[in-house]
């Protein structure tokens, strides 16, 4: 890989009257080495358009599939049972999610951002779905199976209509216009909070079965970071494939605990978190089944639930935006231009439309965990992620095989997520290097946006009941769903706060250099930087076939 970063180092400003003098460069050198800003991260082994060998690509792609599987199973566990679904319904929902994730990921890497991002499930849709479940949980159905299907049909209808929010703001360039008033000051909290806001998927989920979750976390750190230095001959293998090796070891350990009867006399919640013999999932999954349109029946369109989904669509757009910026750093690409982010949000809307048609349980968003995997392995190849879509689609069709891997206990995934999500946080913080890190104004914008976004989102989540009732409780249920969904999302709150503060707080007096605008501006226009086409142009002469707004 070739480093192409531009390194800028400005001379120190003269000291103002009444202020202590700025240390000279000689004094700074005596204090130790300083590192100039670098557009690309060091030590990446493969960038966005460089590829490992095919056998390495296949193994790395399977690793991406395993990482996204955890959140897929988690959201199915969260929503299917409250809907009235049985283990067979859960297996079919997981198959549908995997199938659509494969389709949407392939579309995004081909004609979306073209970054190596996996498009997985979005938890932003959980609150609106819980609202639908609540409305149908009043004994009006003859059986739980009937209630499940009716709920899924309503979710389908709501997803289909709400998808046009993403399509309109994306292909209508409204989202691109928002990105154009961004600066690195705004990107720092947006990217960092995309990961920090998922802290419940880390140690709290791990602690549900600490005897397998904690060993997974510790073993992965030791194997991937320490042993590679002790065993230099296999250091590359440990760095790239330690996740699969450690997961297999801890999964086998969990199976031994299960078979030995360690969980025979524990609570039901502990059994669900720790045991590996989820026979209900294996036995209920069909050998071969291809998800098809309207598999649950004709979609039901209900205005109150459709409006509730609108908020989730906006939240998912903010989540994906933060993930795209993180992926660009970890793939060795320049920051995605505004028109690229906008078209990807529009394509994300098309993905939600397809998910509504095929009967998925939520909309999609860019997977934070899989972007963290780019940093863990130091491989940002687009081809690896594209090949991973084969595994998603294959295991969605051959259900028994998919159910086998879906039986991995969630605390094992949580141990992995503790590391992957932490990497994305650090990537978000790295954007601060392009700004004046000694500016109190910049510190104020970043600090307040970070803290308040997490604090507000945590308040809304902590005060939301299992039935989906949030802190906003007016007479309009659809209005409640929109506000509760928006403010329960740390990334969207961070986007709102940072954008307002950075563009209004001393905006006329703060220099563009201090805000990082000279570095940022070339990436916000189609022809602003010559490398934009290198990373983000469409393949196979698609540019000549599609209208400009779709490019």
Curated annotation (Swiss-Prot):
GO terms for biological process: adenine import across plasma membrane; guanine import across plasma membrane; hypoxanthine transport; uracil import across plasma membrane. Keywords: Membrane, Transmembrane, Transmembrane helix, Transport. GO terms for cellular component: plasma membrane; plasmodesma. It is found in: Membrane. It is a multi-pass membrane protein. It holds the Pfam family Xan_ur_permease. Expressed in the apical meristem 4 days after imbibition (DAI). Expressed in the major veins of rosette leaves and pedicels. Expressed in the root central cylinder, root meristems, root tips and lateral root primordia. The keyword Magnesium does not apply. The chain crosses the membrane at residues 56-76, 92-111, 117-136, 158-178, 179-199, 202-222, 242-262, 306-326, 390-410, 412-432, 442-462, 481-501. GO terms for molecular function: adenine transmembrane transporter activity; guanine transmembrane transporter activity; solute:monoatomic cation symporter activity; uracil transmembrane transporter activity. Residues 1-30 are annotated as: Disordered. Belongs to the nucleobase:cation symporter-2 (NCS2) (TC 2.A.40) family. This is Nucleobase-ascorbate transporter 3. It comes from Arabidopsis thaliana (Mouse-ear cress).
């Amino acid at each position: 890989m070739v480093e192409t970063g531009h390194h800028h180092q400005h001379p120190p400003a003269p000291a103002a009257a009444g202020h202590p003098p700025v240390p000279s460069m000689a004094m700074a050198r005596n204090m130790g080495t300083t590192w100039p800003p670098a557009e690309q991260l060091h030590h990446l082994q493969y960038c966005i358009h460089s590829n490992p060998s095919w056998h390495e690509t296949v193994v790395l792609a399977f690793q991406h599939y395993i990482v996204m599987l955890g959140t897929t199973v988690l959201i199915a566990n969260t929503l299917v049972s409250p809907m009235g679904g049985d283990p067979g319904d859960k297996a079919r929902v997981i198959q549908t999610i995997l199938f659509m994730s494969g389709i949407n990921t392939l579309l995004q890497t081909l004609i979306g951002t073209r970054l190596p991002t996996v498009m997985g499930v979005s938890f932003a849709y959980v609150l609106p779905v819980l609202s639908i479940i609540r409305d149908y949980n009043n004994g009006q159905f003859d059986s739980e199976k009937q209630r499940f299907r009716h709920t899924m049909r309503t979710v389908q209808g709501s997803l289909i209509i709400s998808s046009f929010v993403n399509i309109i703001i994306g292909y209508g360039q409204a989202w691109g216009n928002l990105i154009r008033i961004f600066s690195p000051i705004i990107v720092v909290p947006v990217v960092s909070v995309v990961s920090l806001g998922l802290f419940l998927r880390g140690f709290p989920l791990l602690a549900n079965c600490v005897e397998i979750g904690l060993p997974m976390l510790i073993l992965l750190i030791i194997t991937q970071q320490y042993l590679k230095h002790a065993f230099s001959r296999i250091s590359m293998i440990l760095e790239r494939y330690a996740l699969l090796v450690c997961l297999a070891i801890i999964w086998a350990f969990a199976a031994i605990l299960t078979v030995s009867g360690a969980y025979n006399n524990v609570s039901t919640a502990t059994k669900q978190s720790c045991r590996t013999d989820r026979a209900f999932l294996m036995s209920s999954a069909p050998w071969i089944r291809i998800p098809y349109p309207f598999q649950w029946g004709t979609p039901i369109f209900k205005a109150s639930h459709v409006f509730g989904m609108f908020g989730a669509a906006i939240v998912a757009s903010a989540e994906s935006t933060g993930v795209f910026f993180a992926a660009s750093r970890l793939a060795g690409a320049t920051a995605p231009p505004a028109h690229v982010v906008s078209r990807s949000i529009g394509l994300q809307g098309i993905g939600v439309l397809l998910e509504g048609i095929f009967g998925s349980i939520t909309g999609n968003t860019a997977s934070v965990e899989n972007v963290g995997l780019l940093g863990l392995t130091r491989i940002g190849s687009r081809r690896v992620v594209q090949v991973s879509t084969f595994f998603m689609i294959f295991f969605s069709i051959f259900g028994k095989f998919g159910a086998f891997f879906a039986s991995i206990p969630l605390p094992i995934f949580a141990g992995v997520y503790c590391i992957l999500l932490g990497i994305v946080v650090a990537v978000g913080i790295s954007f601060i290097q392009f700004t004046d890190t000694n500016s109190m104004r910049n510190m104020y914008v970043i600090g307040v946006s970070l803290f308040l976004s997490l604090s507000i989102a945590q308040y809304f989540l902590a005060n939301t009941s299992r039935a989906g009732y949030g802190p906003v409780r007016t007479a309009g249920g659809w209005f409640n769903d929109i506000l509760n969904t928006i403010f329960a999302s740390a990334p969207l709150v961070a986007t709102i706060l940072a954008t307002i503060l950075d563009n209004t707080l001393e905006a006329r007096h703060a220099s563009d250099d201090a805000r990082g605008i000279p570095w940022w501006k070339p990436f916000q226009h189609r022809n602003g930087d010559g490398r934009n086409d290198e990373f983000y142009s469409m393949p196979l002469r698609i540019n000549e076939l599609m209208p400009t707004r779709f490019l």
